[in-house]
């Protein structure tokens, strides 16, 4: 999980989720996991 100020989709399989006012990027590839912080 990378914590970034701006989260972007890295590949086509990535998708954005809003969970408890946090933006998350979730993907099949675990290296693409990101959270806005």
UniProtKB/Swiss-Prot annotation:
GO molecular function: structural constituent of ribosome
Major site of localization recorded for this protein: plastid
InterPro entries membership: Ribosomal_bL36 (IPR000473), Ribosomal_bL36_sp (IPR035977)
Gene Ontology cellular component list: chloroplast; ribonucleoprotein complex; ribosome
Highest taxon above the source species: Eukaryota
Keywords: Chloroplast, Plastid, Ribonucleoprotein, Ribosomal protein
An annotated GO BP: translation
Location of the protein in the cell: Plastid, Chloroplast
Family of the protein in this entry: Belongs to the bacterial ribosomal protein bL36 family.
Protein name, UniProt field: Large ribosomal subunit protein bL36c
């Amino acid at each position: 999980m990378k914590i970034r100020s701006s989260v972007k989709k890295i590949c086509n399989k990535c998708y954005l989720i809003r969970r408890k006012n946090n933006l998350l990027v979730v993907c099949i590839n675990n290296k693409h996991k990101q959270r806005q912080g």
